[in-house]
Amino acid sequence: MATCTLRGLAVAGGGESSESEDDGWEIGYLDRAVQKLKGPLLPEEKNETFKKALTTGDISLVQELLDSGISVESSFRYGWTPLMYAASVSNVELVRVLLDRGANASFDKDKQTILITACSARGSEEQILKCVELLLSRNADPNVACRRLMTPIMYAARDGHPQVVALLVAHGAEVNSQDENGYTALTWAARQGHKNVVLKLLELGANKMLQTKDGKTPSEIAKRNKHLEIFNFLSLTLNPLEGKLQQLTKEETICKLLTTDSDKENDHLFSSYTAFGDLEIFLHGLGLEHMTDLLKERDITLRHLLTMRKDEFTKNGITSRDQQKILAALKELEVEEIKFGELPEVAKLEISGDEFLNFLLKLNKQCGHLITAVQNIITELPVNSHKIVLEWASPRNFTSVCEELVSNVEDLSKEVCKLKDLIQKLQNERENDPTHIPLMEEVSTWNSKILKRTAIAVCGVGLLLFVCKLTLQRK
């Protein structure tokens, strides 16, 4: 019966070019085509046999060849060593044997380290984790970067391995180091949509405000790549998760972070992520994950939670400490109201023109902010309802509020027009008053322009809200 062979090429890990880093190794799981050594081999034959033993994972033959005198640091095509190859295919036993025979865990080829190769290997996280742990136990440096300034933790985060990330940090990996483009491990995880890695990095002290070279934060990178759940989570102002595990010792961290569920199949460990709703994201951001089941059992939505009174918190079994966290978050989310009490009392005769002009300028600026806010909402609002990630209330509620907004803006527009007409009337009367000393022309023109701009801005707000209303009605 013919031997079935699966072949591929082992390439440099971690995003390095396969054209420049191809080591020419054929990999795959082959039937044991290589038998025990039957006699002395020429050096060329011995190297080829060693290479085949490595590709087939024949541990006993590898050991026999090493016993025969072949170097554990043999350099194959493009400078790869046996240990680098073993790490690239996550062969834990082979990595262990080679390390026990004296292989250098800190070897690198053109700044491509064995640890980077292990972190970017194609395999289950369980196998990658074990290989990385072996390399770290032999003093492999977790902060040595490749040519692109990417460190092992960035590769682990990019490929979605939260436990590998945790292990690297426990051994001293810098969680906030940046590559040549300014990407951190958190940025890579957000870019690739790995929610569990994002959460783990925040626990380990990742700074979510570090920007890339083009000025983007991890949340903006997540948004650009359509990972809206991660974007919403990273956009939360309050984040008690940050640095949660930084004060633990290495042993405590490893014990806490490397606990696995034995009931899960090895090939599917850590590979599936729980989808977060708006309630879960809010609670996780406050470190209140333990409340999730309680609130769901009582059918409490995020909207309901955010509008609860103190007696309702207690009635639903929410402790005082948890209440304080929720109320603190609500305080951060409050929108600063315009302090109309500070506006000038224009009825007083001693009010100066400068103060009144300042009032109009502030009002115009507020209108501009409102226009920008509505424009941003219209831009970001999904065109199709199936693209909405988080739970939304009935669109009728939004439409109703938009209708009230349009009505209020229309009323505001009418009042501003009345104000403009009144000021124009006062100006005309003063110009016709023979005892009045005319103001400078440019000042008059400037005041007129301000009033016109204010009126246009208010009308613009009304138009934008009307468009927003139509958009929501289509949904």
Curated annotation (Swiss-Prot):
<feature type="modified residue" description="Phosphoserine">
    <location>
        <position position="18"/>
    </location>
</feature>
<feature type="repeat" description="ANK 2">
    <location>
        <begin position="78"/>
        <end position="107"/>
    </location>
</feature>
<dbReference type="InterPro" id="IPR002110">
    <property type="entry name" value="Ankyrin_rpt"/>
</dbReference>
<keyword id="KW-0744">Spermatogenesis</keyword>
<dbReference type="GO" id="GO:0031047">
    <property type="term" value="P:regulatory ncRNA-mediated gene silencing"/>
</dbReference>
<dbReference type="InterPro" id="IPR042650">
    <property type="entry name" value="Asz1_SAM"/>
</dbReference>
<feature type="repeat" description="ANK 6">
    <location>
        <begin position="214"/>
        <end position="243"/>
    </location>
</feature>
<dbReference type="InterPro" id="IPR001660">
    <property type="entry name" value="SAM"/>
</dbReference>
<dbReference type="Pfam" id="PF12796">
    <property type="entry name" value="Ank_2"/>
</dbReference>
<feature type="repeat" description="ANK 3">
    <location>
        <begin position="110"/>
        <end position="144"/>
    </location>
</feature>
<dbReference type="Pfam" id="PF00023">
    <property type="entry name" value="Ank"/>
</dbReference>
<feature type="repeat" description="ANK 5">
    <location>
        <begin position="181"/>
        <end position="210"/>
    </location>
</feature>
<protein>
    <recommendedName>
        <fullName>Ankyrin repeat, SAM and basic leucine zipper domain-containing protein 1</fullName>
    </recommendedName>
</protein>
<feature type="modified residue" description="Phosphoserine">
    <location>
        <position position="20"/>
    </location>
</feature>
<keyword id="KW-0677">Repeat</keyword>
<keyword id="KW-0943">RNA-mediated gene silencing</keyword>
<keyword id="KW-0963">Cytoplasm</keyword>
<dbReference type="Pfam" id="PF07647">
    <property type="entry name" value="SAM_2"/>
</dbReference>
<dbReference type="InterPro" id="IPR036770">
    <property type="entry name" value="Ankyrin_rpt-contain_sf"/>
</dbReference>
<dbReference type="GO" id="GO:0007140">
    <property type="term" value="P:male meiotic nuclear division"/>
</dbReference>
<feature type="repeat" description="ANK 1">
    <location>
        <begin position="45"/>
        <end position="74"/>
    </location>
</feature>
<dbReference type="GO" id="GO:0071546">
    <property type="term" value="C:pi-body"/>
</dbReference>
<keyword id="KW-0221">Differentiation</keyword>
<keyword id="KW-0040">ANK repeat</keyword>
<feature type="modified residue" description="Phosphoserine">
    <location>
        <position position="17"/>
    </location>
</feature>
<comment type="subunit">
    <text>Interacts with DDX4, PIWIL1, RANBP9 and TDRD1.</text>
</comment>
<keyword id="KW-0469">Meiosis</keyword>
<keyword id="KW-0217">Developmental protein</keyword>
<dbReference type="GO" id="GO:0030154">
    <property type="term" value="P:cell differentiation"/>
</dbReference>
<dbReference type="GO" id="GO:0007283">
    <property type="term" value="P:spermatogenesis"/>
</dbReference>
<dbReference type="InterPro" id="IPR013761">
    <property type="entry name" value="SAM/pointed_sf"/>
</dbReference>
<keyword id="KW-0597">Phosphoprotein</keyword>
<feature type="repeat" description="ANK 4">
    <location>
        <begin position="148"/>
        <end position="177"/>
    </location>
</feature>
<comment type="function">
    <text>Plays a central role during spermatogenesis by repressing transposable elements and preventing their mobilization, which is essential for the germline integrity. Acts via the piRNA metabolic process, which mediates the repression of transposable elements during meiosis by forming complexes composed of piRNAs and Piwi proteins and governs the methylation and subsequent repression of transposons. Its association with pi-bodies suggests a participation in the primary piRNAs metabolic process.</text>
</comment>
<dbReference type="GO" id="GO:0010526">
    <property type="term" value="P:transposable element silencing"/>
</dbReference>
<feature type="domain" description="SAM">
    <location>
        <begin position="272"/>
        <end position="334"/>
    </location>
</feature>
